[in-house]
Amino acid sequence: IGLLGGNNVFQYAPNPVMWIDPWGLVHEKTKGYHVYGLFDVDSKGNPIGDPYYIGITNDTKRRGTEHIESGRLSGDGKISDRKTKLIPLHQDVTYGQARGYEQAYIKHYGTRTGNIGEDISQENRGNKYNSFDTNSKTRRKSRQNYFMKYFNKMTERLDKLKGGKPCA
């Protein structure tokens, strides 16, 4: 981040999609994160099938716009033109809960289908990376345990589902 971070040295990166958090500066118990899925939708905007991408954000409107710009969401931004849709699955959870839930959904729905190094498109629109390494030995133990606590809780819930419908 260097000097691009601005005058406030305590501020988190203003664009967490483009800026990374390699040192884990966002505390796992920080609130205000949302887990969402990207779905194909019918003409009425209802989801068809399982999500093809799972993500987390602290601003769903901004993130939806970024997905339209990248090609992961189709349409020009008008609701009536969309063939895909961002649907919140969990709102206002902690960062650690969001990471755990996100990884559980990625695993459950098999959305890690994106090809690293290839442009995002409607053909290459799945997750390219896992939310976090469930076997990490380098992450602070309490942080890893917090992520895993919510990964395990959501995995258990998803394993009990019938018909693969997301549960909020």
Which residues fall in each region the model found?
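Short turn/helix-capping motifs enriched in Asx and small/polar residues
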Residues: 1-28
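Catalytic toxin/effector domains delivered as secreted proteins or via bacterial secretion systems
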Residues: 26-168
